[in-house]
């Protein structure tokens, strides 16, 4: 039973790593991360210029193989016909196979992370264009001064819309709030506003 429990724990651990590999793959696709080029790597069979996130793809694949085996182990090992059959010994011989897949995946992840370079320009450009993130700050001030339906008003302004600086500042100018609060809101930018993120991160 303890082996089955251990296998289930490894499945959960591997699933977290799969999520990490997929997220990192996505950030590479978005251009938030660049990868250092290795001269001996083949980019693509048809696109020689391409730098594939191959290490993260390899890690994801190997972790998936490990999880398939571990899930079977966890379901099989507690079950025995009248507590007498020997199918468990066949299964136990393959515990090392699952461990091997995990080891290869970890090596791939470490190799992939070692190649990453942060593309600060791309990240800053996306943040600078995301004026809708300031809806939180505007809504908080609206609530403070008793303006009705602040959430609904900001939702109508921002949801599914391309929010620009001019659109948001026109909305702020229309609010019946003290001039000092208006001025404070108008000076906010997506790059400078972090809300309570700093405090919440430190409270962890």
Regions found by a protein language model. Name each.
Residues 1-76:
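Internal glycine-rich alpha/beta core junctions
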Residues 42-204:
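Catalytic-core signal marking the mid-to-C-terminal active-site face
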């Amino acid at each position: 039973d303890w082996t089955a429990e251990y296998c289930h724990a490894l499945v959960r651990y591997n699933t977290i790593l799969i999520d990490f590999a997929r997220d990192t793959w996505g950030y590479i696709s978005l251009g938030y991360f660049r990868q250092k080029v290795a001269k001996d790597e083949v980019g693509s069979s048809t696109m020689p210029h391409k730098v594939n996130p191959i290490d993260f793809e390899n890690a994801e694949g190997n972790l998936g193989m490990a999880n398939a085996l571990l899930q079977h182990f966890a379901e099989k090992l507690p079950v025995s016909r009248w507590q007498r059959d020997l199918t468990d010994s066949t299964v136990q011989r393959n515990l090392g196979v699952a461990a091997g897949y995990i080891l290869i995946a970890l090596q791939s992840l470490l190799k992939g992370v070692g190649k990453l370079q942060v593309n600060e320009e791309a990240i800053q450009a996306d943040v600078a264009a995301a004026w809708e993130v300031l809806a939180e700050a505007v809504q908080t001030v609206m609530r403070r001064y008793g303006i009705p339906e602040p959430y609904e008003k900001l939702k109508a302004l921002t949801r599914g819309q391309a929010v620009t600086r001019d659109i948001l500042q026109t909305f702020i100018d229309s609010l019946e709030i003290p001039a000092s609060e208006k001025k404070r809101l108008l000076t906010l930018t997506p790059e400078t506003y972090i809300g309570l993120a700093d405090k919440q991160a430190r409270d962890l």
